[in-house]
Structures are given as structure tokens and as C-alpha cells.
Amino acid sequence: MDSIASIGASSGGHAGIEIMDIEGNRGYSIHGHDHFPMMSVFKFPIALYFLDQADHGKITLDETLTIKKKDWEKTFSPMLNKYKEDTIRITIRDLLIAIIQVGDNVACDVLLARAGGPPIVNAYIHSLGIAEIDIVVTETQMAADPKTMYDNWCSPAAMNALLQLFYQGHILSATNTALLLQWMTGAITGPHRLKGLLPASTIVAHRTGTSGTSPDGLSVATNDVGIITLPNGHHLCLTVFIMDSQAGEATREGAIARVAQLAYDTMSAGK
């Protein structure tokens, strides 16, 4: 898959790509151990933490947390836009669905506060044997100081390893593995990224991450990571991180889609 490198280069930024056919035990990597800003991709590890806590009886997904809308007026939150009242109570389950399916930033920071802060989630992910990742700042902190967007970083190899451990049932119970896969398959963000050029019927369980674009046209991060079900029944873990690109959104997203398409075609054919 040598042309994967040329697709990555076409993104206009620094591209990190990690591909693994789980059942076929075949992979491909470009800049697999470099550090890339995750943006909302870090909501996948947050979901793993809370579902693991539920598996061990430390929380229940039906526990409710209180949110005051006036505290979050400037924060991206499709979830809160559904409510007219200022003070609302939302279950951990619904907060997790919101971070996975729409990348809700309020839900993310409320969950991080409930966990005890980013370092708690970070330590949990490290305890799984995933070393090349740092989760140290909240969405609120990243919004206040854009330089901190680089502080929540992960290598493509580490993210793909985390995806594989999760999919193979080495992290969560069978019930919660299936639940998170269901939520990730229902994600509505990034339709033109991993899913963009695949057959419409393809099952893609994924989580995107996206920065804003600076006035001079720099996009810090355009990401998509996930698990793709192939026609031969195999499952493809795929991480694509694009960092510091000056290209337009269509170019960045198109590069991710082309990587996914080539990986899908190659691994499906057994090449």
C-alpha cells in the first residue's frame, strides 16, 4: 500500500496513519509513533473509562449529573440545545452517547469532572498498556488557550492498539463492548472521512476529532479513528491523524476517505 504515503502527503499537513486487519494480522504504518493532537478523538478513551467503571460496579450508567446551562453558554453542545430549562439532570449514559455520537464538549467536561479530571482517565488508559497517549486538558482549557490543543496527544500506533484491545474484548465486558460499538456506529460526525468513499452499507464504528482553522488557514487537527467491517468478515482498525494542514477541509477529509478506501479494498482482496 505504498500509495497510502502519497495520499497522506496530499493532506497538506503531517499525516499519521495506522492500519491493522485484526483477523488477518496484517498492518501498515506511516509516522505511527509520532505525536498528534487528538481533539475529540480523546472522547473514545473517556467512554472506555466510564464503561469500565460500570463493569466494576463503581458507577451506574443511570447515575444523573446536574448541569446548569448558564455555565456553558459559549461551549459547543448539541445536547444542551435540546433543553429549555437552565438546570438539567442527565444520565452518564446519555452524556456518553453525546460525546461519542456528536462530540459534545459540555458532556465531555462534565464527565471529566465526574471522573476526577483528565489525569484519572490518562492513568487508566496507561494502565491498559497504552503508553503513547496523554490526556491532560479539558475542552474548556483547549478553547481558552489553543496552544493546549497539542497537549492531548496520541500516536497512531497507540490509538490503533487501543481500538484493537477494545474490539477484541480485552477492556470491557461483552455487553459494554457491544454498547460502545453501537454508539460509535451511530456517530454522525465526519461523514466524509473514514466513511466517505466506502460502500454505504459498510459498518464503521468511529470517533472523529477536529480543530478550528486559524485566520491564516492552519488546521491543527483533522482526525478519524475507528473499526471497519470488511466484506470478508474481517475487521479493520484504522487511525488517520492529520496535523497542521494548510489545505481546505475537503482536501483534508478527502485524504482520510481515500486512505480508508484503499485500506478497505486492499484488505478485502487479501493483497
Specify the residue positions occupied by each region the protein language model found.
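Beta-lactamase-like hydrolase cores
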Residues: 1-34
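Structured C-terminal helix/loop/strand segments within mature extracytoplasmic catalytic/sensor domains
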Residues: 1-7, 27, 113-114, 118-119, ...
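Mid-domain, small-residue-enriched loop/turn segments at the edges of structured enzyme/sensor domains
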Residues: 14, 88, 109-171
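Soluble periplasmic/extracytoplasmic beta-strand elements of cell-envelope proteins
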Residues: 16-20, 29, 45, 66, ...
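Acidic helix-start/capping segments at beta-turn-to-alpha-helix junctions
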Residues: 22, 61-78, 115-116, 183
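Active-site SXXK
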Residues: 25, 37-65, 238
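Short, well-structured active-site flanking segments
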Residues: 52-71, 118, 122, 173-177
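Conserved catalytic neighborhood of penicillin-recognizing serine enzymes
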Residues: 72-109, 118
